[in-house]
Amino acid sequence: PDRLSIAVKEQQPVAYWGEKAFLNPRARVFEPEPSVDLPALPRFEGPDGYEQRVLLVYRQLQDMLKPLHLSVDSLRLDARRTWRVRLSNDLTVEIGRGNPVDRIARFVRVYPAILAAGSGQMVSVDLRYSNGFAVRRQQVDTHAESTG
């Protein structure tokens, strides 16, 4: 009883978890000291107990999106087990329930064609359909102002 043992373990965050916590590489949640500088990291949200699943899906999506020069900025799994991802180009992707990796794989296969097919920046993609998906684009103003 005349000794005090203290163990200090450095935590390396890989993502934000919720509003105030971080997730480490082993999918463990920790809260930093208030004075810690907040790094630029992706933001994850999910139900308690799903940290490991969210981190695994994030890593898989990152690998899949790399050839498209995209990355995951945020990944959310809600209480109904519905997935949503926001990409580095500000594109929101509604993945829905089921296997998010399979649905993103379908998106990755046709992404270059979608880019080439339309005018206006893509704002969101809805992958919840079994036989396709919906793309919402930002409206392009085709009316030029005349000066005279």
Language-model features: locations:
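Charged, solvent-exposed interaction patches on well-folded alpha/beta domains
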Residues: 1-148
